[in-house]
């Protein structure tokens, strides 16, 4: 079976509304990308919670809608344009054919074993383990963020390897796939807890943890609050994004035992000052390492709590 993609270049102000309108008009999937991708004008952009919809797109955005080959693409564009108050003539579009493929095989071919730090391997289930003597996680791409391919995940994993939490309690806040929680457990942490706001992430983390024979408890935030579990930890790791990390500064800092360590990633090098400022009343954070423009911040909680806190 073949498919047809509708490709439309629009201003940032229309990108999200047009995406929704194309869905409503019959598109099977819609993506938004930088119209200047691959050129000197390409603009790195990372959507974060708290962003206005118009901020989560590029000045020149390319909206790509996948449709059945037999669909009336011109009618889909016209309906979408009308629903957002534009004339169809204002939306110039091109079409491109997409041949059907063995998508499972294609996806698998894009994921190879990943070597992280000194002795960690993340290996998809369809690959052989390169080094059975290493610390190995079997992990497939799935519903939740975290396969070790992104610099922020690697930074947190490398921090854990360099500061092995032997016998310590560890909290992975925003656990996603559970990759950091599992690494902590395989590095001989005592109690390990993962928390995420996404039920699908919890489902994914539980599946991955059972596959890797790790003992980790996973909770949604409300479930954790009602669990009776100790609410502070020797090590707290949060690989999220700068805006939510700033908003959660009092809560995350409050999860760290006196003398314990807090590790944050999901922070761009250009965002270091604003994130460290948010945590300054609680924990002094410094840049531990940087990869590809992303940083890991780390700091130790005071042994005694400052007056007034």
From Swiss-Prot:
Domain of life: Bacteria
Keyword check for S-adenosyl-L-methionine: yes
Catalytic reaction annotation: L-lysyl-[protein] + 3 S-adenosyl-L-methionine = N(6),N(6),N(6)-trimethyl-L-lysyl-[protein] + 3 S-adenosyl-L-homocysteine + 3 H(+)
Keywords, alphabetical: Cytoplasm, Methyltransferase, S-adenosyl-L-methionine, Transferase
GO cellular component: cytosol
Name of the coding gene: prmA
Enzyme class label: transferase
EC number: 2.1.1.-
Positions contributing to S-adenosyl-L-methionine binding: 153, 174, 196, 239
Location in or out of the cell: Cytoplasm
Function as written in the Swiss-Prot or TrEMBL entry: Methylates ribosomal protein L11.
SUPFAM superfamilies: S-adenosyl-L-methionine-dependent methyltransferases (SSF53335)
Species this chain originates from: Herminiimonas arsenicoxydans
Family, similarity comment: Belongs to the methyltransferase superfamily. PrmA family.
InterPro entries in the record: Ribosomal_L11_MeTrfase_PrmA (IPR050078), Ribosomal_PrmA_MeTrfase (IPR004498), SAM-dependent_MTases_sf (IPR029063)
Designated name of the protein: Ribosomal protein L11 methyltransferase
A GO molecular-function annotation: protein-lysine N-methyltransferase activity
